[in-house]
Each structure stands twice: as structure tokens, then as C-alpha cells.
């Protein structure tokens, strides 16, 4: 579950009690490999549990209401997420739930069994804290009911906003999700005490909207962390050059450009000189043309689509790649790009502000309209040995953000808030 880059590392002590919202992690059980947002919430769970001297609780919205877990409950929940302990049997409510998968039903049943307190949908359970902070890092459970209930307890509210992409790029969103996202963000703007932004670019977009809604909030900006990469990886054993694209297969990620490039390469190169492309991610929404193209290309020897690759296998695949391809029209933070840079794997990406902020001069920046430049760069890297590429890129890799630095920034901002 935890994948790459969720170990907090050493950070200064957290002197205040915390209620961490774990709704996102609970809702993702049984739904495939963890996403970037999942991994951030998991990193926060690790951090909150790392300080034994102050109270920590977890709040989750599940089918039928809310549950609160104490430290022991959170430790057990984390062990189950990691696969160290099995999920238990589904209880009666889960077995009767027609909208709940078997795995999620088991997870929600365990949450009910582990709960120190429970409530229905209309109000929160009693949280035995009068001082401290509620942390929401998963873009989940951000309703006015939930946040108003938290405010009534006297806790301060700190919300991590990953991006404002649904409002900036509504054309790429599923039907109905833009308004729901705006409702969430308006609740965050009206009821939060602190906003955590993962980049200056995100902070600017959040503040643009929040200022329009009359929310004069303090912000702390801190890049998300990537775990230390000291282990030598047993990389993929395929000797043919290959490239990797990571992320949900949705319109914003612009996989169509990559398919266009590889179709051109197929016409221009002998079969034995064709680089491969691995597309890693679940199929998303509003992308039927790309799905049809992928289906029609299933017999192509140069194309691999992985919809449920685990984190360890993905990390090994990325480590052996000739490059990570990121042709997205917009990105929130882009953890895979940072992880590629940490390994010394080349990155080819669009000319987005977030890439410049975090990666500096490390990537090759290519205009998304310039298919020739993308193809030329891919071919140039294909002709080099992967080890030589990695050696050259490690020498120029940017400063890699750490979770320790991130949590030190958040800790300082929350301490000031209290």
C-alpha cells in the first residue's frame, strides 16, 4: 500500500494532539494500486503515529456514518493497509450494503470494530480532545457537515489542497464532479484555519479562488516528500529500450500524444529498433477514443498497458526505463517525476510551471504541440545505454524534497496556529 516515498524520516517533535482524517485511505481499499493522494494521506498517518507522547485519533466517514479510531485502532488499520494483518469478516451492515465491494466492506467492518466512537451521518462522534488540530490531506470528507462538526469541538482545521485542477480544467472532469469539488473547496475556504499547499503553483491557484470567496487564510507551502532511495534496485530484465508513463488514463494526462508518437515510430523504424512504451495506470473517464486505440493496439509488441501494477514492480520498471514521459496538460505536484529524478531516470515533460518549480533544469521540456521534438528526444535517448543515461542524469538531479522537511514545515505552521 505505502509504495515509494511515504516514510517520514526524522522530523522535529509534534507537541499537539491530532485528529487525522483517514476517509480517503478507508475508501480506497480494494480499488487497485494507491494513487498519489493515497500515498500522501498514508505518509501523514505514519507521521502522526510516530510521536507517542501526544494523543492521535483517526476520523473516517464510512457507509452509514462516522468512526473515530484511537492510536491502537490506527496502528491496526495501518497494519491491515500494509498487508501485515488480514482484513476481518464483513459484518451485517457490510453484507447488506449493495454498493460496497467485498474488500471495502471488510475494511469498513474492521473500522467499526476498531472504533473508539461511532455516529450516524448527520453528526460526528465525540472526539475526546479540546485542543489540537484536525488534518485533512485526502480531498475527502470535506463537507460542511464534517468541517462544521470539527469546529464545534474547538479543534483547529488544517487542510492540504493538492490542486484546483477541476476548476481550472473543467473540460477534463467527469460529469457532476466540478460542482462537487467546488462545494468542497468552498467549505474548506470557509471553515479551515490553515491551508497546506504542495507547491507555490498550487498555493497561487488556491488563493486565486479562495480570495474570490472572501477567505483570508494563512498558507504554508511545502513540497511533498519522496523517501530515501538508498536501495539498489533489481531493475527490469528486458534489454530493449523502453519508456514509462504513469497515471490514470484520463484526458488531462494526454496519452493520445504518446500513442501518436509510437504509431509514427512504427512506420519509420525497423521492428527490432522500436522502443517500447509501458502505460501504467487505471483507465479513467471521458477518454473513450484513447481506450479504443489501446484496445486496437493490444497485439503491438511495443505497447504494454498495466492497470493494476503494484508499487514495488512499478519502481523496478521505472528504474530501468530510458525515460519517464509526462505529456500532461496540467499537474498538481507530480510525484512520479520526482521519483524518476531521484533515480536518475530522464524525464520528458510539458512546459508546466510545477515541473520548473520542483525539477528545475532536470527534464527535457517539450511543447505539447511539438510531436517532432518529443519523437526526436525519445529516439536520442533510445540510442544511448540506459546506464549511461542514468549516470549523466544523476549528476544533474535537482534537490529531492523529503517528508522530514515537509512535516517540519507543517509542524511549524500548525504550532504557530495553536
Located regions from the model:
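Carbohydrate transferase catalytic cores enriched for Leloir-type hexosyltransferases
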Residues: 1-418
Amino acid at each position: 500500500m505505502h509504495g515509494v516515498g511515504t516514510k517520514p524520516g526524522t522530523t522535529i517533535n509534534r507537541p499537539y494532539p491530532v485528529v487525522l482524517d483517514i476517509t480517503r485511505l478507508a475508501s480506497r481499499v480494494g480499488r487497485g494500486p494507491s494513487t498519489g493522494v493515497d500515498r500522501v494521506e498514508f505518509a501523514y498517518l505514519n507521521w502522526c503515529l510516530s510521536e507517542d507522547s501526544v494523543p492521535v485519533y483517526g476520523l473516517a466517514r464510512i457507509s452509514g456514518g462516522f468512526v473515530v479510531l484511537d492510536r491502537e485502532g490506527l496502528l491496526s488499520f495501518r497494519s491491515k493497509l500494509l498487508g501485515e494483518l488480514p482484513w476481518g469478516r464483513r459484518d451485517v451492515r457490510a453484507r447488506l450494503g449493495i454498493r460496497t465491494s467485498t474488500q471495502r466492506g471488510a475494511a469498513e467492518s474492521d473500522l467499526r470494530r476498531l472504533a473508539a466512537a461511532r455516529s450516524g451521518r448527520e453528526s460526528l462522534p465525540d472526539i475526546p480532545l479540546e485542543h489540537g488540530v484536525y488534518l485533512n490531506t485526502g480531498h475527502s470528507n470535506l463537507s460542511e457537515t464534517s468541517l462544521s462538526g470539527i469546529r464545534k469541538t474547538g479543534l483547529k482545521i488544517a487542510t492540504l489542497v493538492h490542486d484546483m485542477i477541476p476548476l481550472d480544467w473543467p473540460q477534463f472532469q467527469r460529469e457532476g464532479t466540478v460542482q462537487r469539488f467546488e462545494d468542497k473547496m468552498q467549505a474548506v475556504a470557509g471553515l479551515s484555519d490553515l491551508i497546506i499547499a504542495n507547491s507555490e503553483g498550487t498555493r497561487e491557484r488556491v488563493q486565486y479562488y479562495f480570495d474570490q470567496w472572501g477567505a483570508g487564510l494563512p498558507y504554508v507551502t511545502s513540497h511533498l516528500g519522496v523517501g530515501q532511495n538508498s536501495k539498489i534496485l533489481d531493475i527490469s530484465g528486458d534489454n530493449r529500450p523502453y519508456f514509462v508513463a504513469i497515471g490514470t488514463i484520463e484526458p488531462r494526462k494526454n496519452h493520445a500524444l504518446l500513442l501518436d508518437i509510437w504509431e509514427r515510430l512504427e512506420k519509420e523504424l525497423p521492428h527490432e529498433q522500436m522502443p517500447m512504451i509501458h502505460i501504467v495506470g487505471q483507465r479513467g473517464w471521458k477518454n473513450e477514443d484513447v481506450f479504443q486505440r489501446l484496445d486496437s493496439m493490444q497485439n503491438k509488441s511495443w505497447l504494454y498497458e498495466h492497470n493494476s501494477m503494484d508499487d514495488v514492480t512499478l519502481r523496478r520498471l521505472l528504474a530501468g526505463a530510458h525515460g519517464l514521459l509526462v505529456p500532461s496538460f496540467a499537474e498538481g505536484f507530480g510525484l512520479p517525476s520526482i521519483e524518476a529524478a531521484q533515480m536518475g531516470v530522464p524525464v520528458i515533460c510539458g512546459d508546466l510551471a510545477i515541473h520548473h518549480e520542483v525539477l528545475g533544469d532536470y527534464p527535457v521540456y517539450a511543447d505539447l504541440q511539438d510531436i517532432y521534438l518529443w519523437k526526436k528526444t525519445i529516439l536520442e535517448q533510445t540510442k544511448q545505454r540506459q546506464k549511461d543515461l542514468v549516470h549523466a542524469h544523476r549528476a544533474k538531479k535537482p534537490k529531492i524534497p523529503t517528508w522530514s522537511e515537509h512535516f517540519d514545515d507543517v509542524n511549524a505552521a500548525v504550532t504557530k496556529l495553536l
